[in-house]
């Protein structure tokens, strides 16, 4: 397929979506009502297969859908793991009954998922997890601890990895479950970060229960299922392109999915600032720079004419474009390691964008808003909301090279699985889990 063919197909997709938005977007709908329209039409999770509540689109086209919805002035799909991680994992490894039962509430925002993978003793070495699942008839009983659980305090279900056979090698005795987070045996404790937010949580599981009907994939084959989840996580990170402009340009604040956050019954139009107009529709078709957020911020701060700032903005545009093109390249045929390379690149991009944002803000960058009241006050200062976002990005930039698999893990995967380099010495992958050496 040529670049011209891709562009034509992209324009056709945008035209179809804009026509649908003109007919169906209504800011007076509740968030839940709007997301149900969006999800059941396949626009909320367009990468899912057409028979699984999606449209079978590539990641590049899915990003185009997201940007078009935002620039049109409508509320986008539910953010988070329900659409990006849980749904594609379930559609890949689940039964037809599980797909029809679990995917619709996820893509329509009725329930929110979190990821119960990492543990205090199993982060980079995820297969070393110790959380146990013991079968009791049609129920599995879960005991263990998880940590760095993003959005756990808002989750209805968790993507749980638990050890179901400690006598097997560590990669072979793991099973993937969709666990109900609303039960007495699940204790969620938020972890406040230096940004002022509590994105992460630690989760204690004490005789918690999960039905065997909510087991995704075969017993003890959870590592293969988890690799699907991780592939989508890393691919999603690598496809962002570093942009901070058009995808969030019309959001006043983010709407959260699920029953806990309380956004489903709120008015959808209260989460966006733009209404559909002819000008907005035409703007939806125009390509935008991955560095658009920094361009707008530099203009607001009066430094757009400074040569060094302009040079680094161009660098941000180039890096973001390369990330997008890597995603486009992977559409033609599977590229080994492309998700890992993409995540490595995104780690570099967020750190570059952190430094660029601080260079644009100058002394203004020393001020950060730690709560909603402070954010409202600081949005009135030079730089506005863009400055508030830039300081938050600066404090959070180092997280991406760590979560979802550290940069070092990505390089190991590329070296061993793509380049065929020897594995690290001391490989213990064939030993049964209960014979592995452990800290006292």
Regions found by a protein language model. Give the residues of each.
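A structural signal for short hydrophobic beta-strand segments in well-ordered beta-sheet cores
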Residues: 131-134
